């Protein structure tokens, strides 16, 4: 879908993107605050941000309860949600074009004028407890926060987070909202048919009842190499594994595009070098690899599930193919195929207003950078074998990594798999 992007900076310190999608019949809203778990005041109330997010659509200045607010918000089919991460709290909504202003007003009252109540707090503490307990039955959810911890990130696992819920008091919720929900800490992306509406939207956002504050700095952790770690689960008859490598700098956009193509070559399809080879031999039903750029560090991750009896053979393939990349063994034919795939996926990724909004929001909420949708094809075509290989070599050269797994197997088996990877460094 054709669209144009304008960045606006409001007098109250808020910033955001207004994305005009001519002819769109849907409006999409996203509002982000640096208000996630890392900004909670004390570790013993770590889950405060998450519980507050659950309470965000409860009683407020205009509605006495969550049920009353929900009934009004959704009466014409509109959707809303919120989510919390280590750094962010994000409020999202989608609605029919004809009611965009009503929905924006309803978001305003929920975000700016909540009336946090003790009854709601107790209910949402129970709901969050149920949510996190459910995650403990998902071995991938159990694994990756532990990987973060092992590398040195100052985060809690879901089990640790569960133990902090009882400590949260109503004043903790109120304090976290006052601290984080300020106009200077707010970023937004609004997408839809905006012709003739931009000034009204800006005026509405300028009137939001948020105090001035600050855009919080992203905390920095010192990352380190860690020993292979097994999370023992007697019910885990296979191995859920994660191999994470860290590089002590933010890789640039060109390097990230190159790593995306490299990961496609390695694990992206049924005919890929690692996943495709494993599937052909019946060794693993599914696995992935991906690279990401953080504020101070970048990561290259491999993960998946494998039966214990076939894990050695899968890791032999992983080690062999990563070694081949380090040795420069990527063909122009493989590069061209990966570029063609990336170009197609890019074009398919802007079919809806929400997809367009999401293309911009992740990066914009992170560091304020406005991606250029039209230049992505050029960036993909400019990917080179040399950049892929050099970036992969830099990850290996940093030697900051860990292998972790969830299984009923033993530590000795995981250490044996780790030894196969160790030879790459």
Predicted regions and their residues:
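Active/ligand-binding-proximal structured segments within catalytic/core domains
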Residues: 20-73, 243, 253-266, 274, ...
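Short strand-connecting beta-turns/loops that link adjacent beta-strands
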Residues: 22-25, 236-237, 397
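Short, surface-exposed beta-strand/loop micro-motifs that present aromatic residues
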Residues: 17-20, 177, 227-232, 392
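Acidic, glycine-rich loop-and-beta core segments that form the ion-binding/anion-interacting portion
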Residues: 236-238, 244-247
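Charge-rich, well-structured scaffold segments of protease-associated domains
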Residues: 62, 67-216, 220-222, 247-250, ...
């Amino acid at each position: 879908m054709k669209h144009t992007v304008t960045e606006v900076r409001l007098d109250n310190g808020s910033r955001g993107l207004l994305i005009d999608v001519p002819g769109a019949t849907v409006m999409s809203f996203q509002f982000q605050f640096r208000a996630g778990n890392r900004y909670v005041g004390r570790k013993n109330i770590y889950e405060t941000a998450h519980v507050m997010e659950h309470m965000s659509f409860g009683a407020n200045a205009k509605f006495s309860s969550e049920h009353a607010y929900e009934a009004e918000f959704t009466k014409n089919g509109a959707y809303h949600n919120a989510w919390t991460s280590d750094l962010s709290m994000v409020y999202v909504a989608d609605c029919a074009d004809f009611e965009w202003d009503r929905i924006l007003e309803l978001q305003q009252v929920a975000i700016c004028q909540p009336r946090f109540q003790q009854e709601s707090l107790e209910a949402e503490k129970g709901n969050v407890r149920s949510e996190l307990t459910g995650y403990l039955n998902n071995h991938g959810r159990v694994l990756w926060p532990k990987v973060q911890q092992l590398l040195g990130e100052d985060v809690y696992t879901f089990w640790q987070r569960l133990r902090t819920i009882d400590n949260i008091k109503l004043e903790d919720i109120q304090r976290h909202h006052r601290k984080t929900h300020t106009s200077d800490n707010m970023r937004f992306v609004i997408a839809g048919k905006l012709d003739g509406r931009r000034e009204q939207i800006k005026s509405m956002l300028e009137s939001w009842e948020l105090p001035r504050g600050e855009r919080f700095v992203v905390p920095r952790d010192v990352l380190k190499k860690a020993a292979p770690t097994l999370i023992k689960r007697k019910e885990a008859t296979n191995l859920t594994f994660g191999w994470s490598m860290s590089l002590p700098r933010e890789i640039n956009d060109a390097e990230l595009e190159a790593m995306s193509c490299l990961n496609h070559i390695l694990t992206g399809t049924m005919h890929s070098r690692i996943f495709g080879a494993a599937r052909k031999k019946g060794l693993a039903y599914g696995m992935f690899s991906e690279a990401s750029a953080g504020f101070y560090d970048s990561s290259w991750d491999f993960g998946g599930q494998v039966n214990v009896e076939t894990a050695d053979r899968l890791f032999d393939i992983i080690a062999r193919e990563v070694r081949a990349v380090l040795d420069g063994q990527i063909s122009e034919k493989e590069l061209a195929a990966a570029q063609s795939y990336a170009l197609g996926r890019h074009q398919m990724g802007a079919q809806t207003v929400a997809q367009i909004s999401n293309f911009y929001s992740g990066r914009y909420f992170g560091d304020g950078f406005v991606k250029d949708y039209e230049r992505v094809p050029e960036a993909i075509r400019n990917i080179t074998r040399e950049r892929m290989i050099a970036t992969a070599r830099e990850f290996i050269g940093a030697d900051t990594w860990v292998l972790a797994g969830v299984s009923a197997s033993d530590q000795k088996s995981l250490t044996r798999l780790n030894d196969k990877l160790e030879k790459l460094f």
